[in-house]
């Protein structure tokens, strides 16, 4: 089974004010992709937090976009590359997009 070439991973909690950025933006993106006839090229994934398991969602993709609310980010958003060589953080809680990408490079790629 082939996967869409692009994946968008959005995290956040809709019940926590500005932490709802990821899910709200993902919902708008889904509508736009449908309207433009591009939905088949994207897999949209929503979760409360980025987890190690999300590294598996990167397999066989051309590109990935991580969406999350941030603290002290320039308004209204910041778009920046993720360093795959950042050391993965270890936590039983959420991990950063850089850590997800680092796990992907260590385990999947």
Where are these regions (language model features)?
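N-terminal catalytic or cofactor-binding beta/alpha core of small enzyme domains
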Residues: 1-109
């Amino acid at each position: 089974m082939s996967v869409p070439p692009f994946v968008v991973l959005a995290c956040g909690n809709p019940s926590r004010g500005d932490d709802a950025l990821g899910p709200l933006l993902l919902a708008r993106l889904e509508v736009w992709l449908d309207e433009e006839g591009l939905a088949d090229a994207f897999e949209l994934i929503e979760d409360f937090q980025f987890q190690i398991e999300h590294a598996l969602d990167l397999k066989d993709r051309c590109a990935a976009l991580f969406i999350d609310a941030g603290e002290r980010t320039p308004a209204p958003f910041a778009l920046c590359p993720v360093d795959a060589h950042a050391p993965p953080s270890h936590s039983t809680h959420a991990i950063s997009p850089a850590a997800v990408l680092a796990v992907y490079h260590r385990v999947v790629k």
